[in-house]
Amino acid sequence: MYNVTYHQNSKAMATSDSIVDDRKQLHVATFPWLAFGHILPFLQLSKLIAEKGHKVSFLSTTRNIQRLSSHISPLINVVQLTLPRVQELPEDAEATTDVHPEDIQYLKKAVDGLQPEVTRFLEQHSPDWIIYDFTHYWLPSIAASLGISRAYFCVITPWTIAYLAPSSDAMINDSDGRTTVEDLTTPPKWFPFPTKVCWRKHDLARMEPYEAPGISDGYRMGMVFKGSDCLLFKCYHEFGTQWLPLLETLHQVPVVPVGLLPPEIPGDEKDETWVSIKKWLDGKQKGSVVYVALGSEALVSQTEVVELALGLELSGLPFVWAYRKPKGPAKSDSVELPDGFVERTRDRGLVWTSWAPQLRILSHESVCGFLTHCGSGSIVEGLMFGHPLIMLPIFCDQPLNARLLEDKQVGIEIPRNEEDGCLTKESVARSLRSVVVENEGEIYKANARALSKIYNDTKVEKEYVSQFVDYLEKNARAVAIDHES
């Protein structure tokens, strides 16, 4: 049974952007997939809607709500859901960070078990809108039967979604016409413009550990697309000029950009972790340090970790490596840094083995570049601070992001062997120095700085949010419904 924790109060409502007199207050429910790369943008979007004076109910599971306590705005109503027990999941596993990628299929199975609880919430509270994620394939039809307007908030980049399939039916039936490796490693025929956005052969090989039996991600996403009144993207028109109209054409549904939702730098300067890292960074020359982070969930092999480490050593550059011991391709794999690496690079390298405050690190004046896996959130955070990117994509959307960003000349992708994806220390070192040290890196630095100005334009961001909320107000349930009637 769900447990609604009300943080909202009349005083808080009065301090938010007041609703124009002739508009009704909406009730918007939001329900993300159980991955923090999804949960945090959903929570941020929820806060922005609430700040416009609307009631927002944020749905997630009990343990995740507890983890989010410092992020939750008092304007938001929190709805705690009890995740059904699935035998194959570890005890208390309620997010993708809690499980090996092989077991994410069971987390999706558990989320599917939330259907009765979420349905009861919708029946009893009758929100005007429900904003959901790609996994919740069963939710659009339930919401439609209750007269609730439906939006899919996609935290994946629009070019990735456009690449995956030409229509929701193609997603559902796994029938986009691509049957060969060559088909999948060239831009699809439904792209009406030239682009480098496509997978390579070694990208396809890396997908295998993520494939699982049961309801496919394609089916889930296709059903979500098919049942939605609109699609929401964490994007600017300026960065998705071609892609957003293409998605509208492919899926025949309105596509609404909500802005980039850039995160805020935490205000606690006395955080012990940050104090230690800052002290190290303060001792380095301005614009000299490369920040390295590959996310907390990607599968990275022992060979890749060794070559990346030796490449950092070979480059001669100062670095901070947020090294949360990666998960190997199999559960039994043990991934370790090469012997002696930490000691040999101690004078110019900091290997941080627990959680690292990424935004704070990227904001420090000594940082000059970002070696990243190209997750969509990390891209925004790196470019917010004008850092050129050294890109080492791992799987799924990350290679597609890297191809587009390399084409826009905000960084370069570290070369791999085209057949097997093998990485070498020489390619790592050469890529780092090309972006950070050599003259050829000046174009990447200049373009990253230019994007930083766009990403930090608060006026533009506020306009996107206002237009998005205005869309919700004008299109709720197709006709205005007074909550008091």
Curated annotation (Swiss-Prot):
Cited SUPFAM superfamilies: UDP-Glycosyltransferase/glycogen phosphorylase (SSF53756)
Highest taxon above the source species: Eukaryota
Record: residues binding UDP-alpha-D-glucose: 296, 355-356, 373-381, 395-398
Keyword Glycosyltransferase found: yes
UniProt GO molecular function: UDP-glucosyltransferase activity
Keyword set includes Transferase: yes
Naturally occurring in which organism (per UniProt): Stevia rebaudiana
EC number: 2.4.1.-
Family from the record: Belongs to the UDP-glycosyltransferase family.
Protein name per Swiss-Prot or TrEMBL: UDP-glycosyltransferase 91D1
Keywords: Glycosyltransferase, Transferase
Role summary: May glycosylate diterpenes or flavonols in leaves.
